UniProtKB/Swiss-Prot annotation:
InterPro entries recorded: ATP-grasp, ATP_grasp_subdomain_1, D-Ala_lig_Van_CS, D_ala_D_ala, Dala_Dala_lig_C, Dala_Dala_lig_N, PreATP-grasp_dom_sf
Binding-site residues, Mg(2+) 1: D265, E278
Record-given protein name: D-alanine--D-alanine ligase
Matches recorded under PANTHER family: D-ALANINE--D-ALANINE LIGASE, D-ALANINE--D-ALANINE LIGASE B
Amino acid sequence: MTSAYDKLHSTLDVKAFGRVAVLYGGKSAEREVSLKSGAAVIEALTSAGVDVVAIDVGDDLLARLQNEKIDRAFIILHGRGGEDGSMQGLLECLGIPYTGSGILASALAMDKLRTKQVWQSLGIPTPRHAVLASEQDCVAASAELGFPLIVKPAHEGSSIGMAKVNSEQELVAAWKDAAKYDSQVLVEQWIHGPEFTIAVLRGQVLPPIALGTPHVFYDYDAKYIANDTQYRIPCGLDSVKEQELIDLTARACDAIGIEGWGRLDVMQDEQGRFWLLEVNTAPGMTDHSLVPMAARAAGLDFQQLVLAILADSVATRG
């Protein structure tokens, strides 16, 4: 029996990938998550027979890429230096094909403000927001947006530096904390309602996942540590709303230029409307991660998932 997801599978012989550098670790605030993701990807590719070179990205990266005679790179770096277009630019200069989105889409997706501006320009729903650079900005945002609000560093992932606030005093404190991670800080309207995450792979939207957590929101602990986070596949939406969510995901990813794979985070408000939060171009691949869960629901085990991501780099970049 055929499935709508059958075309996601890699049909390539592993020799077609050549010598593959798995780029992980790095120096961003998400290093620990990337180390776990990288270890899982390395194990899966190695067991599939791929010629893998594991590279914990540091100051010797350029020399290692050249000395190891790398044919292709699997980017599983999270955050700055790996997910923001800079690594993609380096690999383009070296002529090394790589997984995932290109330079522009990676840079856009890593910048929450620019992502929102692109979506807004196309009429794609995303929560109202303001940029915080001073206590005066906090006062103005409080008056304009009301409470509750959520504060976010504009260029961090894994919910690092994020906080929900219910007063102007809390907003000022959260802005100061977020500013330790990023010179640009966003504050958004808090959306009351369920949260969904939707993975995309090789141009296809995978089954949406509904998230539930006893935490205030789906924070770092809920994502990577806690065992009380709830994941629901099927997501519980009726067929019409689920298709609306899938179509919105495809449109939002196309607007940013997402390639290969990624993951979109979405809220649904009390009126049933969807609001896009952000998109990740190199999502987590740990034992708590969401893309592997969505892939399983689409009929791909973890090894098949990483081979599909790698195969897409052959299709798009040779």
